From Swiss-Prot:
Protein name: 23.5 kDa heat shock protein, mitochondrial
Keywords, alphabetical: Mitochondrion, Stress response, Transit peptide
Residue stretches making up the sHSP domain: 102-210
GO cellular component, one term: mitochondrion
Targeting presequence: 1-20
PANTHER family linked to this entry: 23.5 KDA HEAT SHOCK PROTEIN, MITOCHONDRIAL
Similarity remark: Belongs to the small heat shock protein (HSP20) family.
Gene: HSP23.5
Quaternary organization: May form oligomeric structures.
Keyword GTP-binding: no
Subcellular location field: Mitochondrion
CDD domains: ACD_sHsps-like (cd06464)
Source species of the chain: Arabidopsis thaliana
InterPro entries linked: A-crystallin/Hsp20_dom, HSP14.7/HSP23.5/HSP23.6-like, HSP20-like_chaperone
């Protein structure tokens, strides 16, 4: 009986077709940086040197993934509230807060948004693009930002190249959309959207008392 059991065990171990449970199969990990920093470029900070690198665009797009959605510049439309909520969540992460907006890998976000008392401030990294390559437009309450540069010789044209498109939906009666200012300098786009004052928002007209 013992010899027959040992023989059966040898046959099992020598078999080349042993079924492996799904739970034990190796799963290829997804790099966190590719999910959290899907922009035209990310900046690596090493010894105080600012270096530009193109990021990996092959990002997993599982439905409902908040972080990949909010950081993807090719998402059709994102709301301002989503962007501000994301910034609040990031600021609560000790490591990110300590590195001033950089993740554990030392990579800075490709965009930033700050809401102050008087205006909304946007910063978007668009490396390789000049002021002439960037166009901003307002479609009802949606701010549309487009950038497209000429492809240099030897540059891969099969991907997105130097193209950037983003649509940010602004809430109604909060910002002075007719006073939006934009500045493009050194591959960085800065947009300032003034806020409507509280009394202007509520159509309040103050009357002087003689």
């Amino acid at each position: 009986m013992a010899s027959s059991s040992a023989l059966a065990l040898r046959r099992l171990l020598s078999s080349s077709t042993v079924a492996v449970p799904r739970a034990l199969r190796a799963v290829r990990p997804v790099a966190a940086s590719s999910r959290l920093f899907n922009t035209n470029a990310a900046r690596n900070y090493e010894d105080g040197v600012d270096r530009n690198h193109h990021s990996n665009r092959h990002v997993s797009r599982h439905g409902g993934d908040f972080f990949s959605h909010i950081l993807d510049p090719f998402t059709p439309t994102r709301s301002l509230s989503q962007m501000l909520n994301f910034m609040d969540q990031v600021s609560e992460i000790p490591l990110v807060s300590a590195t001033r907006g950089m993740g554990a890998s030392g990579v800075r976000r490709g965009w930033n948004v700050k809401e102050k008392d008087d205006a909304l401030h946007l910063r978007i990294d668009m490396p390789g693009l000049s002021r002439e390559d960037v166009k901003l437009a307002l479609e009802q309450n949606t701010l549309v930002i487009r950038g497209e540069g000429e492809t240099e010789e030897g540059e891969d044209v099969s991907g997105d190249g130097r193209r950037f498109t983003s649509r940010i939906e602004l809430p109604e009666k909060v910002y002075k959309t007719d006073e939006i200012k934009a500045e493009m300098k050194n591959g960085v786009l800065k947009v300032v959207i003034p806020k409507i004052k509280e009394d202007e928002r509520n159509n309040i007209r103050h009357i002087n008392v003689d």
